[in-house]
Amino acid sequence: MGIAYYNLNNRREALNDYKILVSQYPNSPEAEDALDNVKTIYIEESKPNEYADFMRQAGRPLSMDAEDSLTYAAAKTQYDNGNTNAALNAFNSYLQKFPDGVYAIEADFNRAEIYNGKKDWNNALRAYEAVAADAPNVYAERAVLAASRIYFFELKNYEKAEKYYQQLKDLTTNNENKLEAMRGLLRCQYQLQQWTEALANAKDLADAKGSSTDDKALANMTIGKSYQVNNQYDLAISNFKLVVQNNKAALAAEARYEIAACWFAVNKLSDAEKAAFETINKSGSYDFWVGKSYILLGDIYFKQKDYFNAKATYQSIINNTINNDLKNEAQAKLNKVIDEEANSSKVNN
């Protein structure tokens, strides 16, 4: 009768019949079959603890390993059937009971996937990071990739994203994931202005098979920045010029400005002025870099003791920009020009 009830989806009656059979004929072949069917029902209903209790009462207590496997199987059944809320509760119960269980890594990964699907980023990350911390394992690469993306795209936490993109780069043998790791790592280092630290990875990305034109532009920009902060201006300018060749958007505007800044740093003021005007004329839709270029022109005039044009240039930024950082920078420099001009007049008088 138990089988008939089960086929009719009447699990309660099926369980009762199986339990009676086990109780009355514990050593019969039929009892063994009944025990298997009881196990199936409890797993399908995600009630592993009740099954363990039943087996103890039947005089057949489960081993710790068997209970571990059973508890996980119940959770996985819910997950495979798309019952994500029930699966999540079951995975959490499994990990609470078996934190170092045979399936702990798999349970953490599966619950991370559920949390990720719900956009519960913090809980997803806790689970993904637990899997990543136990690398190498079969789920580590996917966990590290997911953690990287959440930190970078959703939370804008570039320090954490950098950590996991680096781990992904070290872990993966998949070319697509390797490219994403290098690209993500470089974007993090760019946001964090870690120019010197980014140099090796930027060169890797620039030379990587399958890297895009945008990848190469960002890599060359970063390489240029690395040389620039280390006062290797010729090498910096060479890489910034490669950016201009490979990119027609914001990176090109920034690269043009940085070329001008490098010329200014080595006191080649004519070249700096020419490069600043090139930024203004060829990247006119990028207000920030146009503003920075005008400020640099003011710096050039100031260095040449051309106080009139320096003041006029800084004042034009103050009057026209909506960027408060640029406005404040121009105002501070204008004040210096006014002070120096006043002091110069006193000396001449």
Where are these regions (language model features)?
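Acidic, polar-rich low-complexity tracts and alpha-helical solenoid repeat scaffolds
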Residues: M1-N349
